[in-house]
């Protein structure tokens, strides 16, 4: 039987925010990613580097938006807006640094297996373990691609954001 207090506790730490990214900006980033940006098959990372088990752990393409690149500042502004909303509820949450921004693109049959995001140095982190994960949803015109966090499925809308702690209590996946 599910413990109601546990569900409430989890929900307290998972922030879902609508309309963080405008529809127009979502479309521009998606168009740029489809037609200009070089996405490549994602590789699953561990604390020791790339995993030999990547194909069973993840099937998607990804690419990084780095400072100075087109749309980087737009993405950063939206990220900071989502973070600010999260911090309004969680006053002790402080974000001093962040990595560049990764775009994940799932095609038919794509997935990311259940995992947590607290891997030191896996994606350019140079200041310790990540404290928060923030996801910006750029589209919702697809079937499947269900986002699951802490064993609960979230319905996400284009332009929305989800923010949650990057620790063992919040494993997540895309199915």
Name every feature range the model reports, one short phrase each.
Residues 1-161, 169-175:
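Fe(II)/2-oxoglutarate oxygenase catalytic core
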């Amino acid at each position: 039987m599910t413990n109601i207090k546990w569900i409430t506790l989890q929900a307290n730490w998972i922030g879902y925010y609508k309309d963080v990214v405008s529809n127009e900006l979502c479309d521009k980033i998606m168009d740029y990613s489809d037609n200009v940006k070089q996405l490549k098959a994602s590789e699953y990372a561990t604390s020791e580097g790339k995993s030999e088990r990547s194909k069973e752990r993840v099937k998607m393409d990804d690419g990084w938006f780095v400072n100075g690149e087109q749309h980087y500042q737009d993405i950063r502004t939206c990220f900071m807006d989502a973070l600010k909303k999260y911090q309004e509820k969680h006053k002790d949450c402080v974000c001093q640094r962040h990595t560049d921004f990764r775009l994940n693109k799932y095609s038919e049959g794509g997935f990311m297996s259940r995992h947590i995001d607290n891997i030191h140095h896996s994606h350019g982190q140079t200041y310790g373990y990540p404290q928060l994960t923030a996801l910006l949803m750029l589209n919702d015109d697809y079937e499947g691609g269900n986002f699951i966090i802490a064993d609960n499925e979230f319905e996400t809308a284009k332009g929305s954001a989800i923010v949650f702690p990057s620790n063992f209590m919040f494993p997540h996946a895309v199915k």
